[in-house]
Amino acid sequence: MSVLRRRGALSLRELSLSTPVTVVSCRARSFSVNNRPPPKYPGHVPLNFVERGALAVGSAVGALLNPRRADLIAACGEATATPYFIYRLRDAMLSDPTGRQILRERPRITSETLPLPYLRSLPENSVGRTYAAWLDREGVSPDTRDNVQYIDDEECAYVMQRYRECHDFYHAVTGLPTFVEGEIALKAFEFLNTLIPMTGLSMFAAVRLKPAERERFFALWLPWAVRSGLASKELINVYWEKILEKDVDELRGELGIEKPPDMREIRRMIREQKKREKERLQQSA
């Protein structure tokens, strides 16, 4: 009997020692990449809290060091938009008739859905013609926008995709170019209109501007962004595809957007002024 008791005690002791190991391995497995939840839509990459935080910090730092890295800007936008900000933007669409229509129909802005030859044939000063002229002048295409990956809610993922694809329309309506000075000015406007954190964080890239550019940003573009961003309607609710023939000046008035000074023209005038001063100094020497 004593032997049986000892054996029973030994087996119980072995069981008690092995049980915590099993629990620990199960807990560790729950954070394993192999145990990641299934994607909720094509291209979706589910992230846990730590992964999302690392993505937000890493992409933000990378985008600050190289503001032309559109992939890092996109990743930062997605990582910092949840849990609150993208839902606020989605709710803004749900509270607006046009926004609800966009969410139902889910249009995409590409060179196939908006052919450039058609846009170029539209009346002068129309929204579509202005958009096409801006694309031609800046040498960009609507097909370069990355697909959303890191937002878990499928409907909110579309909202972020919609914002991303409408970004060039914001450029066209305001006339702001794609070089860094223009992008920062537009991001400041977008932040006050959409409250997407990435657009606000993008303003830190102003530290990388040349002193004269940074001075212009705080003297001209930031005050304009504050005025127009706070006064304008929610741009996410604009169904751009249905107003292509509308006069762009009329649209700006309806949306409450003040047209900023022509950034390219200002830079051209400054270059010419510097050239004249240089020639004058050479002649006087």
Curated annotation (Swiss-Prot):
The keyword Glycosyltransferase does not apply. Residues 1-38 form a transit peptide. Keywords: Lyase, Membrane, Metal-binding, Mitochondrion, Mitochondrion inner membrane, Transit peptide, Ubiquinone biosynthesis, Zinc. It is a peripheral membrane protein. One of its GO terms (cellular component) is extrinsic component of mitochondrial inner membrane. Its main location: mitochondrion. It is an enzyme of class 4 (lyase). This is Ubiquinone biosynthesis protein coq4, mitochondrial.
